A protein has these predicted regions:
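Transmembrane alpha-helices and adjacent helix-loop boundaries
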Residues: 1-268
Length: 268
């Protein structure tokens, strides 16, 4: 047992150095790209003209239907060969992770927009709100609160997805664990990596849950409404319709849907 902990102590510094840094950079960059891609494709698939919806759907299905490993190799080898632009290992990892998980995130965005009650859309139309004002002041605050649980799951999946970026010569946590394994054995190296991955996922998940709670409190949602809103979003993602989600989870008065920054504090 003493030898095990000695080997574990040997493994940790290397894993917490270059390995952890590469993993965190890949995750942070991939998360930014993922959110941008998810919002762009999700809104286009829900609100765009027919031709834009088709492009959004084809793009989503392409990145969801092909392997992340294949996408990594495609970006790493194909783009430099045919364009002369060498992205390097780090940018290849960020781009591949962002596009792959962004395609899944697009369905989270589209499903959350579907889950906003139909009465809210009708209210904004009756008030002749411009599209940008409608989305920013009424629709998006509701949809954002419904998106966060799905984005929470995707963030955790993204963290685990960084384990394959070593295939494009990036010295991430898993790559460094494999190097340490050759020196001190399998158990210490990968137990250390497991603990580090878990801690990262726990921190990210906690932050996302805090964001989710704040977004829902700003809309004045109680525990029952929060659970029902989550269920409606899940139904929309699994093929439900907006009509099925329009059960009055949120107040139908469009004016009352404008987020009140002080509401959360007053409710508390």
């Amino acid at each position: 047992m003493g030898e095990f902990f000695a080997d574990l102590a040997t493994a940790l510094p290397r894993l917490l150095g270059d390995g952890l840094q590469a993993t965190l950079i890949s995750f942070a960059g991939g998360a930014v790209v993922m959110v941008i891609v998810a919002v762009a494709l999700g809104v286009a698939g829900h609100q765009g003209p027919k031709w834009l919806q088709v492009i959004s759907r084809v793009t989503v299905e392409f990145f969801r239907g092909t392997s992340l490993v294949v996408q990594l190799f495609f970006i790493f080898y194909f783009i430099p060969t045919f364009t002369g632009v060498d992205l390097g290992s780090t940018w290849t990892a960020i781009l591949a992770l962002g596009l792959n998980y962004g395609a899944y995130g697009a369905e989270v965005v589209r499903g959350s927009l579907n889950a906003v009650p139909a009465g809210q859309w009708e209210s904004t139309t009756a008030l002749s709100m411009p599209w940008m004002t409608k989305m920013r002041r009424v629709i998006w605050p509701q949809a954002w609160a419904l998106m966060l649980p799905g984005f929470n799951n995707l963030m955790v999946m993204l963290i685990k997805g960084t384990a394959v970026v070593g295939l494009v010569l990036l010295s991430d946590l898993t790559f460094e664990a494999e190097q340490v394994r050759r020196q001190v054995g399998t158990w210490p190296a990968f137990i250390a990596a497991l603990i580090i991955y878990y801690v990262i996922a726990l921190i990210v998940s906690t932050i996302m849950r805090v964001m989710e709670s704040r977004a829902q409190r700003r809309l004045g949602l109680g525990d029952y409404e929060i659970r029902k809103a989550r269920k409606d979003a899940a139904n929309a993602l699994s093929g439900g319709t907006a009509g099925g989600a329009a059960g009055g989870v949120l107040t139908p008065d469009a004016a009352s849907l404008i987020p009140d920054p002080g509401r959360g504090e007053r409710d508390a």
